[in-house]
Structure formats: structure tokens, C-alpha cells
Amino acid sequence: MSQSHFFAHLSRLKLINRWPLMRNVRTENVSEHSLQVAMVAHALAAIKNRKFGGQVNAERIALLAMYHDASEVLTGDLPTPVKYFNSQIAQEYKAIEKIAQQKLVDMVPDELRDIFEPLIDEHHYSEEEQSIVKQADALCAYLKCLEELSAGNNEFLLAKGRLEKTLASRRSAEMDYFMQVFVPSFQLSLDEISQDSPL
């Protein structure tokens, strides 16, 4: 039985910091971001199914979101303004991501590859699955901006405005629900979110 470096690589996602060009009150790494995106994507899928007649697999969407940035362990986290500076750079970066995704898939033992390839290679995502993961990814970036701004870090003011436009372009009923029910709490202190539920 040959060894695989797959999970050793994924473990290093925690070493890759997001928002590398910006001053952060609290640094966020790709590993913790991926977990939050997985939780939010699962919630969006569950809301879609329960409230708006959707029929998506919420558990699969959570897994897709968990692995959505896995290729960054090989490429690093390129800052968004650089990644989307123009269409040519965006297209080339997509090609690099695809190569990195395939390299990760190739690390998985043959007998497990059919399980992990559909999670890592985004070409296996349906349009609806991809849409929900992208919504969750943008929402989590927006939540990071709210947290930084609440801590007095105005460095994230323009990013918040840019993400509001992104969220508007990806708007859905389930996102509106999430924004109304869950997002306001992210601007409150621990005391404020704890006062209704004493231990």
C-alpha cells in the first residue's frame, strides 16, 4: 500500500492566510474560512429546501464548500484585486486552479479517487451547487468585513462595499433569509449575543 500526501497537503491550508494585503485585527486562514463556508453553504441549502421549495443535497454542498479552496494549498491565496484585475489574468488563474485541483486529485489513492475527485474538481459541481457555494464564499468574506469593521478596522470598508455588490449579483431568497436572520448578530459583542441565553 503506497503512501499519499493528500491530507498532509490539506493540513497546510491553515498556514495560508487570507486577505494578505490588508491589515487584519484577527488573521484568518484558508482552513478556518473553508469550515465557515461549509457551514454557511449547508445553511443556505437547508433554507432553500425548507423555506423555498428547493431539492438540493445540503450535505453534499457542505462537502463541496469544505473543499472549495483546497487547491490554494498549491497555488496560495491570490488577492482578489489581483485575481480579477482583468479577464486574461482571471482566465489564466482559473487554468492554474484546474491544474492544482488535478494535482490534488492525483494524490488520492486510486481506490478512493472517485469519492474525492467530485469534491475537489469544480467541473463536477452542478450549476446550482456552484451557485450556493459561491454565495456562501461571498457571504463569509462579507462577514469577515463586518467583524473587522466592528473592531474598528476601516481597512475593510471598501472590501465591504465591493462584497455588497457581489452579494447583490448573486442574490437569492435563501441568501436574503440568511442576511436578515443571521448576519445582524455579527456586528454585536459577545455580551450582546449572550444576554438572551445565560448558562
From Swiss-Prot:
Location relative to the cell: Cytoplasm
Gene3D superfamilies reported in the protein's UniProt record: Hypothetical protein af1432
Residue ranges constituting the HD domain according to the UniProt record: 30-142
Residues annotated for a divalent metal cation binding in this entry: H33, H68, D69, D137
Top enzyme category: hydrolase
Reaction catalysed by this enzyme: a 2'-deoxyribonucleoside 5'-phosphate + H2O = a 2'-deoxyribonucleoside + phosphate
PANTHER family for the chain: 5'-DEOXYNUCLEOTIDASE HDDC2
Family recorded in the similarity comment: Belongs to the 5DNU family.
Protein name listed in UniProt: 5'-deoxynucleotidase KPN78578_26370
Organism: Klebsiella pneumoniae subsp. pneumoniae (strain ATCC 700721 / MGH 78578)
Taxonomic path: Bacteria, Pseudomonadati, Pseudomonadota, Gammaproteobacteria, Enterobacterales
